[in-house]
Every structure is written in C-alpha cells, then in structure tokens.
C-alpha cells in the first residue's frame, strides 16, 4: 500500500458529513496499527494527511467515535503522532478542532492512554503547545506527551515492523541525520523550518541517559 503523500490541500467546497468521514477514512489519518513494546495497541496519526480545510469538527468527532474509539478496546494503549510536514496553511486542524477532539474523547479512554509519541516536533508545534497546551488539555495528558526527534528512538518504544510510517517521514528523518543543526534552529530546512525549542516549561530534562532524544512535556500546574 502506498502511503507516501496525499494530494496538496486546495480551497474546495465543504463535502457532506458522510463524504467528509469517507475522506478521513480513505486518507488513513487515524489508524489502529501494531503494538508498543508493552504489547499495547497503537493509534497512529499522520498529521500531514489531515484534510483540515475540508472536514468539520463534527465529521472528525463522528469518525473517531464510530471507527476508532470502539476498536481501542478496554486495555491501555499508546498514540504515535507523526508531525512531519504539518503546516498551518494546509493540514493543521486549528485550536477549536483540537479542543473539540479532546473534549470528545471518553474519560475512560483518556485514563487508558499511556503515552503520546510526538515524532518530529518543530518550533511552531512546541511553541503552540507551550502557549496553548495548558488551555486545551488537562495536565494529565501533557505528562503523557513525549517528543521524539528521530524514528530510531520511536522504535525503542514501538514495535517497528508493526507500524507503517510514510516514506516522507523517513526522508525527513534522514535529512535530519545529515543536517543536525536543523534540530536547533541553526540551519534552515527550506521551505519549512525544523528547529528545537524547550518543551512546555522552561527547564528541559531527559528521561534517562540512554534515551537522549525523547522529552516528556510537563504542563505548568
């Protein structure tokens, strides 16, 4: 199956509610796939695939309630969110949509969520979460959010052969290996910036010495 890249977002008329849900399903924005190293289900989310200009909050929430939430089961699970190539003009859902999705998640699912692995975070995403994370999400979710700068560190937590990752994510990961200064904002990743900034609070602490590229964001209480 080819999961390289969806067509670029364009200003098209809003689809019917049913067609919006079909579009989300076709693009495989959300997909329950594989397990983490603890044997728990993984919900993979590809940010680049999200058709932000073509779907409503209602369509997204209905899709999640009908297709995703029931299939997560009654056991703990993790989320792998691939942020590669997400931008405000095409596929960023916006504050209202993020809040709507969060509010629609059943409390039992929020309790069973073990970790959100945020792959390839950039400057804008970190600043956004540092600024609005406290307003959008409860502190419990913030504590479960872990930044992953390279795919190699994701595979320390998730079974590699069980989770599909689009080719453009691997391409960007390889580019970061050859241009490491992009992580720290010292080199441009034209046409999109890939830089590093501290997580939600001003202090940054590593989870442990062996897991140097994954950070846990702590929201301000």
Please provide the spans of the model-predicted regions:
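Basic, amphipathic alpha-helical/coil surface patches used to engage anionic, phosphate-bearing ligands
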Residues: 1-221
């Amino acid at each position: 199956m080819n999961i390289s890249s969806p067509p670029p977002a364009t200003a098209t008329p809003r689809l019917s509610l049913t067609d919006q849900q079909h579009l989300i399903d076709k693009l495989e924005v959300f997909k329950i796939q594989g397990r983490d190293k603890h044997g728990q289900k993984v919900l993979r989310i590809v940010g680049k695939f999200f058709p932000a200009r073509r779907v409503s909050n209602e369509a997204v929430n209905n899709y999640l309630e009908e297709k995703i939430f029931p299939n997560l089961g009654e056991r703990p699970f993790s989320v792998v969110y691939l942020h590669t190539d997400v931008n405000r003009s095409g596929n960023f859902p916006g504050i209202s949509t993020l809040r709507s999705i969060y509010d629609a998640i059943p409390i039992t699912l929020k309790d069973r969520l073990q970790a959100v692995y945020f792959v390839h975070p950039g400057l804008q995403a970190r600043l956004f979460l540092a600024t609005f994370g406290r307003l959008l999400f409860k502190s419990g979710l913030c504590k479960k959010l872990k930044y992953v700068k390279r795919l190699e560190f994701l595979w320390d937590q998730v079974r590699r052969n069980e989770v599909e990752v689009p080719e453009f994510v691997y391409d960007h990961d390889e580019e970061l290996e050859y241009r490491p200064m992009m992580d720290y904002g010292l080199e441009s990743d034209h046409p999109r910036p890939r830089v590093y900034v501290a997580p939600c609070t001003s202090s940054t602490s590593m989870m442990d010495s062996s897991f140097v590229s994954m950070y846990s964001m702590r929201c301000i209480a």
